[in-house]
Amino acid sequence: MAVPFRRTSKTAKRKRRTHFKLSVPGMVTCPNCGEAKLSHRVCKACGQYKGKEVVSK
């Protein structure tokens, strides 16, 4: 098996990992009830999506 010729420095390792990060979910407020919800998804509090009741509460 191949083995690295030189040890990877802290800087090189950290530069490689700059793109390895978590992304923040797209949160918006529900226009019906004002609760925070994920965009393009049904509101968990009132059950509405795009002004229509999808889930009966």
Swiss-Prot record:
**Name recorded for this polypeptide:** Large ribosomal subunit protein bL32
Q: Which family does it belong to?
A: Belongs to the bacterial ribosomal protein bL32 family.
Q: Which NCBIfam families match?
A: rpmF_bact
Which InterPro entries does the entry mention? Answer: Ribosomal_bL32, Ribosomal_bL32_bact, Ribosomal_zn-bd
Q: Which GO terms describe its biological process?
A: translation
* Keywords in alphabetical order: Ribonucleoprotein, Ribosomal protein
Q: Does the keyword Ribonucleoprotein apply?
A: yes
Q: State the superkingdom.
A: Bacteria
Keyword Lipid biosynthesis recorded: no
| Cellular-component GO terms for this entry | large ribosomal subunit
Matching Pfam families: Ribosomal_L32p (PF01783)
Q: Which GO molecular function annotations are given, in alphabetical order?
A: structural constituent of ribosome
Q: Where are the transmembrane segments?
A: none
Q: Which PANTHER family match?
A: 50S RIBOSOMAL PROTEIN L32 (PTHR35534), LARGE RIBOSOMAL SUBUNIT PROTEIN BL32 (PTHR35534:SF2)
Q: Which organism is it from?
A: Lysinibacillus sphaericus (strain C3-41)
